[in-house]
């Protein structure tokens, strides 16, 4: 069982700019659509866990639904799944550990944890096992940080670090417990 973060950050650790935009993710050309690890991640996982804000961002992209696995969305305000996504998106509520235990019981053991607030909440509860962080060579100077305050330090071990697309540094970390 593993809870996995797969995310891009700026050099200064932001996942969105000051306006909450992700345009900077297009700053590195990828004309041949070379995969940077997303395809193997999607093959590995059983499902995704994200918050409502991240779901809204994904829906705003105006493209085909990017996930082939079930998406579990934490939301205190959402009462129903957007029309057309009832077989793809499932609402969850409750304590993280309880929701995870329920998902694991249902066979969802390898989970992709996505979205700033959701990742921070999982880290606060020490529920992240692996992180793949891709750093873009740009300083945003502010915005939504990937990491927030923690009760205690969490140690991770570098498993792999490589340059992708000739300019992005992608590092895989595994939690040391």
Model features per residue range: what roles?
Residues 1-177:
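Enzymes that bind and transform nitrogen-containing heteroaromatic metabolites
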């Amino acid at each position: 069982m593993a809870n996995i973060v797969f995310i891009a950050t700026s050099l200064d650790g932001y996942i969105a700019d000051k306006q909450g935009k992700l345009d900077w993710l297009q700053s590195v050309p990828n004309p041949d659509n070379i995969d940077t690890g997303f395809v193997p991640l999607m093959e590995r996982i059983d499902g995704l866990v994200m918050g409502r804000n991240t779901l809204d961002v994904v829906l705003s992209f105006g493209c085909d639904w990017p996930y082939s696995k079930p998406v579990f969305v934490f939301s205190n305000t959402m009462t129903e799944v957007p029309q057309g996504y009832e077989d793809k998106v499932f609402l969850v509520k409750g304590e993280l550990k309880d929701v995870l235990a329920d998902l694991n019981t249902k066979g969802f053991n390898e989970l992709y944890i996505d979205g700033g607030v959701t990742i921070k909440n999982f880290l606060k509860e020490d529920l992240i096992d692996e992180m793949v962080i891709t750093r873009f060579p740009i300083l945003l100077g502010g915005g939504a940080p990937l990491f927030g305050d923690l009760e205690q330090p969490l140690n991770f071990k570098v498993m792999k670090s490589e340059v992708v697309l000739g300019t992005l540094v992608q590092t895989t970390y595994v939690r040391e417990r």
